[in-house]
Amino acid sequence: MANITKKWLRFQLLMASFVIFFGAGLSWAHSKQETTVPANNAVLTEAPAELVLKFDKPMRITKLALTDRFGNDYEVQRTDQMKHVLKLVAQLDPVPKGEYKVDWRGLSEDVHPMKGTFSFTVK
C-alpha cells in the first residue's frame, strides 16, 4: 500500500511540475490586441484611409473583415502578407457614412487561435 501511495505522490508531483513549467509559459506566450486605429467605438467625421491593429506579441492575422451594419462587406488591402506582425496595416477604399465593424482572427506565435472585433462610425 505504501508503494502505491509513493507512486501516486510522484505522479502528482510530476503533473504539478509540468503545469508550472509548461502551462504557465504557454499562457504567457499568447498575443493580445493592444490598440486599433480607428479606436473602438470611435466617431469619425471622415472615412479612415486605413485600419491599424497593434499587438503586444507577434500575431499572424488569418482573417480581417470590414462590414457595415447591414452586413455588406468592404475590401481591405492588407500589407502583412500573412506573416507574424506586431502591427497590421490594411488600406481601405473610401467607405460611405455609417456604422462599421472590423472582425479579425489570427494565430499567436505559439499557434493559439485568437480573435477580436472593434467598431467605428463615420458621420
Model-identified regions with their sequence ranges:
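N-terminal non-catalytic regions of secreted/periplasmic and cell-surface proteins
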Residues: 27-64
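Bacterial N-terminal signal peptides that target proteins for export
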Residues: 2-14
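Short hydrophobic/aromatic-rich motifs at helix boundaries and adjacent loops
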Residues: 6-7, 33-36, 73-78
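Acidic, low-complexity Ser/Thr/Gly/Pro-rich repeat segments typical of extracellular/periplasmic
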Residues: 52-121
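Bacterial N-terminal signal peptides
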Residues: 12-24
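Extracytoplasmic/periplasmic copper-protein system
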Residues: 2, 25-33, 113-123
